[in-house]
Regions:
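Surface-exposed extracellular loop regions of Gram-negative outer-membrane beta-barrel proteins
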Residues: 2-60, 126-130
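Exposed, low-structure sequence patches enriched in small/polar residues
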Residues: 46-169
Length: 169
């Protein structure tokens, strides 16, 4: 991982899971799984812009085209407001044997907005209402929308780093 600009970083990784022998009981498709990736974490000097971006590719026996997973999350947070944009795609054939993949063959898009109040004293460092919308599509099925979530919430952050959130979906 390398630092870029004032507070951002860029990282590369390789994960290799491979059997050490030729076993009769082993399915040939499970002999190995490799994932390579690049991750970028964005943080502006004043912390008003933050983001996380990644692109990963998996390799396994009988590999087909694709096998990608990618995500871009961008947050803009001046003092009182917070806006989040998130988009993620996980190809149907992406496989990470040494990690967790929630949904495959899905494009997820999310947007959120919140307003923050900052008390002058006390145990609460900030609190405020927010809204989030998440949509899920399946590109291989003519971009059919397969799920969505709408959320209204109230978030409370304490000075000891604890967080409490009421969520209505």
């Amino acid at each position: 991982q390398r630092k870029m600009f004032s507070r951002s970083s860029l990282g590369f990784f390789v994960v290799n899971r491979q059997t050490s022998g030729d076993y009769d009981f082993l399915d040939p498709e499970n002999k190995y799984n490799r994932v390579i990736g690049i991750d970028y974490n964005l943080a502006s000097a004043d912390n008003s812009w933050t983001g996380k971006y990644y692109l990963h590719k998996s390799f396994q026996p009988g590999d087909s085209k694709g096998n990608y997973s990618g995500q871009a999350t961008l947050t803009w947070q001046p003092r009182r407001f917070r806006y989040i944009f998130d988009i993620q795609y996980v190809d149907e054939d992406f496989r990470a044997d040494l990690g967790f993949v929630q949904r495959k063959g899905v494009l997820k898009n999310g947007n959120g907005f919140s307003y923050n109040f900052y008390p002058k004293s006390g145990k609460v460092s900030l609190h405020g209402p927010g809204a989030m919308a998440l949509y899920y599509w399946r590109p291989e099925s003519e971009w059919k929308k397969i799920d969505h979530t709408y959320s209204l919430y109230y978030n409370i952050n304490f000075t000891n780093q604890a967080t409490f959130r009421f969520d209505f979906r």
